[in-house]
Structures are given as structure tokens and as C-alpha cells.
């Protein structure tokens, strides 16, 4: 299955194909001339897949190097980026060469940021290996790293030259890592894709059912995201819909300590919290919060988090990228399959943090 992200200045394809990881070289040779490439990955993915991808790239004529770092959200920072830069200099990567991001969301965001800033930008591609990355973070060109103040506070908008998705790699994910990816999938069903929501409703919620439906789930999610990205690449309008649950979710990730609560888990908690308060305020229809809770719990996603520190969460979300002066853009779901943006005073977010 193939989808096109038809941006006027930088169109690219998303290829979703079982077993495609071993064909990475032939895929990349359709995008780039044989050249020097660096695979950026983490130590866990490196053990599983780096050699397979490296051999495939070398067979296609690419001079290939591998850089890996310690897995996890705690590594997604400028210190790790500096280590990437050091490695790129060491192997002599030039502006005509490229970077292959092989891994989950942390790898994709960090490798993309390094690619977009090294020598003012080199080409890169995404080969996502986690469900979260396959359905969300590998598409759309958002790159970045965390700071002590906020998640993804430093970053760029830089589109990849292509995205290669092999659903079979999901079989090597741990159960928690697989399940957390469903946080983003549930979000897509809520904000845009009623057909996806119906498919999720028919599933039994087990990890086995996620793997069985993986291709369809990935396709629907990528299709929603690529349409929104084409309409609003730089996150000024409808692309904000993709942030449903993320305002509070990112605050949870930052205050808990990066990596303690996984991204998809934080999104699920954020969607439930914002919906619960919005429903009380009459901004979302009665009963929708229970629907969200039921769907999240069916797939094993958390819907609450302790300790819930309202003051710390509020302080974290004041650094949110959707904040504009003393207001913030909050995404809500007025009905299943659609989203809306509400600009509210930043101070009012305190109400959305109350239990």
C-alpha cells in the first residue's frame, strides 16, 4: 500500500508493506543516488535490525555507517544530538549524503532534527519500527528534542524524502510498547476517521488483534495525517487537530520524567481528562468521555495518572507550542469523527486539570 504526501515543495511517498525492511536498499535507490548514508538508531533497534538494513543498503551501492544511542525518551535531547553531529563529522558526511532514521518516535524525531540542522540540512528518510512512529511521528516533518522545560521544545519542520513502513517489525515490540501506539490510533478515529473508529470498536483489544489489524490501522492513520499535513504543513490550522489529548499529555510526560509515562499513554490520559472537563462545560457531547475511556481501556491504555499535580502540570503546559501570548489553542471533539479548535485564556487551563 502506498500513500502520497503531496506537498507542493516536497512531495514524498509512504510505503506500507510487510517484509519491506529487507528491501530498504532497493527502496532507497529509487529516492537517492548511491552515496554515503548514516543509519541513526537506538541500541535496542540496532540489535534487531541495523545489520539487516545496512546489508540491504550496501547491496544497493550505499556506503553505510551505523550510529546508535541508548534507547528511550531520556536520550531525546541536545546532548545526544551533539553525539550524532560528532559521528557525522567523523565519517565525513557531506550535504549530498543522507541519514536513515531507523527506530521509534524518539529516533525519528532526533535523527530528523540532526539531519535538518547538520550543515544546514541533509536529506533523510524514515523507517519507523514502533506503532507510534508508524502511525504518527514518522509522517509530516516535525523533528525535535526535549528540554528540561518542555517536550519537543527545540525542533524544526523538515520533511523526509520517504517513509518505509514494515508492519512485521511490530512483532518484536514489547506488549507495553505495542499498546501505547494505540493512543494515537484512537485519537485518529476520534478526530477524523469514523471508519477507523468502527474497526477499533469491532476488535477485541488484545495485542494479537492489534497485530492482525496492523496494516489497516497504519493505513487509515497515515491517510488521516497526510491529508491534514498537506492542508496545513506548519501547524497553524487544522494540523492542530492532531494535538487532541497532547496539551495535557505532553505536560504529563514532562512532569513525570521523560520515559516514565510513554507518549501514547500520556495522550490517552490527556484525551480522557480534557474530554471529561469539556463535557461538563458543554463543549463536548454527553457520553463521549465514556466512549473514549471504554476504547482506551479495551486496548490496555491508562486513563488516569498518579500523582496528579495540578500546579506542576499547569507550569509545564505554559511552555506548550500551542500557547499564544496569554491564550492557548485547545483541541476538542464536538462529535465522533470531527475536531474543533478553541482558543481559551491560558489561565482557564487550570480548570481542565481539575479532577
Curated annotation (Swiss-Prot):
Pfam families associated with the record: DHQ_synthase, DHQS_C
SUPFAM superfamilies membership: Dehydroquinate synthase-like
Cofactor binding notes: Binds 1 divalent metal cation per subunit. Can use either Co(2+) or Zn(2+).
Gene Ontology BP annotations: amino acid biosynthetic process; aromatic amino acid family biosynthetic process; chorismate biosynthetic process
Presence of the UniProt keyword ATP-binding in the record: no
Residues that hold NAD(+) according to the record: 71-76, 105-109, 129-130, 142, 151
Primary subcellular site in the record, as a coarse category: cytoplasm
EC number(s) given by UniProt: 4.2.3.4
Reaction catalysed by this enzyme: 7-phospho-2-dehydro-3-deoxy-D-arabino-heptonate = 3-dehydroquinate + phosphate
Domain of life the protein comes from: Bacteria
Keywords: Amino-acid biosynthesis, Aromatic amino acid biosynthesis, Cobalt, Cytoplasm, Lyase, Metal-binding, NAD, Nucleotide-binding, Zinc
Cofactor(s) essential for the protein: Co(2+); Zn(2+); NAD(+)
GO cellular component, one term: cytoplasm
InterPro entries: Dehydroquinate_synthase, DHQ_synth_AroB, DHQ_synth_fam, DHQS/DOIS_N, DHQS_C
Function, as annotated: Catalyzes the conversion of 3-deoxy-D-arabino-heptulosonate 7-phosphate (DAHP) to dehydroquinate (DHQ).
Family listed: Belongs to the sugar phosphate cyclases superfamily. Dehydroquinate synthase family.
Protein name (record): 3-dehydroquinate synthase
Organism: Streptococcus sanguinis (strain SK36)
Amino acid at each position: 500500500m502506498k500513500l502520497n504526501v503531496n506537498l507542493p515543495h516536497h512531495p514524498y511517498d509512504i510505503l506500507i508493506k510487510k517484509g519491506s525492511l529487507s528491501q530498504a536498499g532497493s527502496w532507497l535507490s529509487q529516492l537517492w543516488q548511491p552515496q554515503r548514508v548514516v543509519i541513526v538508531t537506538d541500541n535496542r533497534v540496532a540489535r534487531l535490525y541495523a545489520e539487516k538494513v545496512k546489508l540491504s543498503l550496501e547491496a544497493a551501492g550505499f556506503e553505510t555507517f551505523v550510529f546508535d544511542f541508548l534507547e528511550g525518551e531520556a536520550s531525546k535531547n541536545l546532548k545526544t544530538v551533539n553525539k550524532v553531529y560528532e559521528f557525522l563529522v567523523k565519517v565525513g558526511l557531506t550535504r549530498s549524503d543522507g541519514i536513515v532514521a531507523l527506530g521509534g518516535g524518539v529516533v525519528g524525531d532526533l535523527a530528523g532534527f540532526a539531519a535538518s540542522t547538520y550543515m544546514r540540512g541533509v536529506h533523510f528518510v524514515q523507517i519507523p519500527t514502533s506503532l507510534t512512529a508508524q502511525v504518527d511521528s514518522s509522517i509530516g516533518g516535525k523533528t525535535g528534542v526535549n528540554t528540561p522545560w518542555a517536550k519537543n521544545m527545540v525542533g524544526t519542520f523538515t520533511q523526509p524524502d520517504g517513509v518505509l513502513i514494515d508492519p512485521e517489525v511490530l512483532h518484536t515490540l514489547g506488549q507495553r510498547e505495542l499498546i501505547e501506539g494505540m493512543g494515537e490510533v484512537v485519537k485518529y478515529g476520534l478526530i477524523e476517521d469514523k471508519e477507523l473508529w468502527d474497526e477499533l470498536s469491532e476488535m477485541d483489544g488484545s495485542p494479537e488483534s492489534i497485530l492482525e489489524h496492523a496494516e489497516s490501522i497504519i493505513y487509515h492513520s497515515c491517510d488521516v495525517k497526510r491529508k491534514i499535513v498537506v492542508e496545513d504543513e506548519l501547524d497553524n490550522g487544522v494540523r492542530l487537530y492532531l494535538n487532541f489529548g497532547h496539551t495535557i499529555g505532553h505536560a504529563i510526560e514532562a512532569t513525570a520524567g521523560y520515559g516514565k509515562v510513554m507518549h501514547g499513554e500520556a495522550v490517552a490520559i490527556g484525551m480522557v481528562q480534557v474530554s471529561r472537563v469539556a463535557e461538563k462545560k458543554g463543549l463536548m457531547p454527553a457520553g463521549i468521555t465514556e466512549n473514549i475511556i471504554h476504547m482506551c481501556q479495551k486496548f490496555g491504555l491508562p486513563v488516569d495518572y498518579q500523582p496528579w499535580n495540578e500546579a506542576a502540570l499547569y507550569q509545564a503546559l505554559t511552555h506548550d507550542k500551542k500557547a499564544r501570548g496569554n491564550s492557548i489553542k485547545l483541541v476538542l471533539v464536538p462529535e465522533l469523527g470531527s475536531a474543533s479548535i478553541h482558543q481559551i485564556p491560558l489561565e482557564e487551563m487550570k480548570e481542565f486539570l481539575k479532577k
